[in-house]
Amino acid sequence: MPFYKQPWVFSKVFVLAMAKPPSFGCCFFLLFFSFLSSSFVSFALTDTEAAFIVQRQLLTLPDNGELPDDIEYEVDLKATFANTRLKRAYIALQAWKKAIFSDPFNTTGNWHGPHVCGYTGVVCAPALDDSDVTVVAGVDLNGADIAGHLPAELGLMTDVAMFHLNSNRFCGIIPKSFEKLKLMHEFDVSNNRFVGPFPNVVLSWPDVKYFDLRFNDFEGQVPPELFKKELDAIFLNDNRFTSVIPESLGESPASVVTFANNKFTGCIPKSIGNMKNLNEIVFMDNDLGGCFPSEIGKLSNVTVFDASKNSFIGRLPTSFVGLTSVEEIDISGNKLTGLVPHNICQLPNLVNLTYSYNYFSGQGGSCVPGGSRKEIALDDTRNCLASRPEQRSAQECAVVINRPVDCSKDKCAGGSSTPSKPSPVHKPTPVPTTPVHKPTPVPTTPVQKPSPVPTTPVQKPSPVPTTPVHEPSPVLATPVDKPSPVPSRPVQKPQPPKESPQPDDPYDQSPVTKRRSPPPAPVNSPPPPVYSPPPPPPPVHSPPPPVHSPPPPPVYSPPPPPPPVHSPPPPVFSPPPPVYSPPPPVHSPPPPVHSPPPPAPVHSPPPPVHSPPPPPPVYSPPPPVFSPPPSQSPPVVYSPPPRPPKINSPPVQSPPPAPVEKKETPPAHAPAPSDDEFIIPPFIGHQYASPPPPMFAGY
């Protein structure tokens, strides 16, 4: 069992001496009672007890855990002390003793009387500002298994430079009064049950070097200012932090930083390359993603680099060869592709390289387990290496390998944005070009259509209403045909996860879910064809300028009755229909821009006035164009009129639906590959043990 989850067991021996053997019922009762008593002592602090302690702390804490300046004068003490600082320490320690709920080893049993320097776990030393004055310089209660909370009175011990409480059962928050401990040098509250936001009191300590919050329940964001402190060790692992890793990480002079087992998101900051003193960096088991920044290769002093169980994508940067001091590299449990470079496995000090549970399709000769570097522990299982055993299936590999990631466009690796968004933008551009070519073969019909319309716009109202009357019929047919393929897409999307056998992946596939957003970029190509009908209409909207004259007359009001029948499906299938309904009116300005091309072919309009015959075939294409506006424009006009102004950025509207659909499809992939047969133990290989009491000048 991991050391941080050990139940603190304490045995008890019950001796039952009785003159007469008890009856079986009485014996059973006594044995049962003794079992309950011993089991109660053996278990760690329950949630109910923890809640009770937290409630006690909240009832005793002043506002925000701050202390009034005259608190020491509010305590009537009959004992005498060598100096005022020891008196203040006595007040603080007595308040702390009252806040203790359980002390199984009786560690604080001798916390009585004014001689605080004799208390167990209390360290005294000459004051830094006056060597003739003895003060409480530190508290060391590591491993005492004490349950309780921290009272605000602890802020009275302003000479404390060392505060070690690891491996206890303290609950509640870190009081704000700790800001007064300006001499704090080492602060270790790891392996307890503290809660609340990040304890910002650390930001007020000018000389703190060691900061350890491991194995607690702190949550929220980590302030960027933390990495601007002159800290040598920063332990944040195994909490509930959810923020991104600040870019200020590169300003930290720390030699050890751990982010493991939280919920950090975003990228590894590119500033990491500025951490010249860094020896160990652990990102394991978070929600980090994107490509690895090439700046990692500047960490020439790093011995441990662990980025396992995240959502990193793309190829390994060639700059990794700059990790000349590295001994252990763990990048398993991601979505990395490409090759494992030969020169990475040739690093002089490398002892362990784990790149299992990725999608690598090739590896250098020295990276093959049992190859030329037999002294190195290598793990390449569950990749896409054709010649190696225990690899992923071809179908499983195709899901990721067929969607390569260009890290030069990835924001985490220095690109302007992720490749997923630009790709849909580029895809629509060719789509409108194709409709432009389509009008060219039939320029005569659209040209003939506008020619009569402009010549007699007022005279045509009568035929115009007739055409809309004919249009609803095809309109009703076309929308029905278009929703059918739309649902077919979602139906087809769930199939791949069923086909892809990923149930044996022991790693949390949530990273895979998160990272499928970039790969969809190439997949977004299918959606554009689905939405391509809307793009072609815009060129067709070049005629609509005259058609806009019909919209003003409420001739199109008849269509609304049928559309309501079809309006439910669009919202059911996807929001794009309502999104595209505004675009036609919004795109109406662009058509005038595109209308210049029609005017060029407008030279042909005058000749054939027999446009009425062609319009029927031409009306068949327009129905898709006109049907959406009449069918959906009423809903948009009546229900959300303000939406059109918000959607004044139509060009971007086409891409958003695609990413949205892709983000929904990945969850389909995510649930499939879930399996917990193989459990990765927590990272305990490199323990930064709490240092002994400080041996610096004055203490």
From Swiss-Prot:
LRR repeats lie at residues 133-157, 158-180, 182-205, 206-229, 231-251, 253-275, 276-299, 301-323, 324-347. Residues 1-39 form the signal peptide. Keywords: Cell wall, Cell wall biogenesis/degradation, Glycoprotein, Hydroxylation, Leucine-rich repeat, Repeat, Secreted, Signal. GO terms for biological process: cell wall organization; pollen tube growth. Hydroxylated on proline residues in the S-P-P-P-P repeat. Expressed in flowers, stamen, pollen, and pollinated carpels. GO terms for cellular component: extracellular region. Residues 411-699 are annotated as: Disordered. One of its GO terms (molecular function) is structural constituent of cell wall. Gene3D superfamilies: Ribonuclease Inhibitor (3.80.10.10). Transmembrane segments: none annotated. Residues 421-466, 482-504, 518-659, 690-699 have a biased composition (Pro residues). This is Pollen-specific leucine-rich repeat extensin-like protein 4. The gene is PEX4.
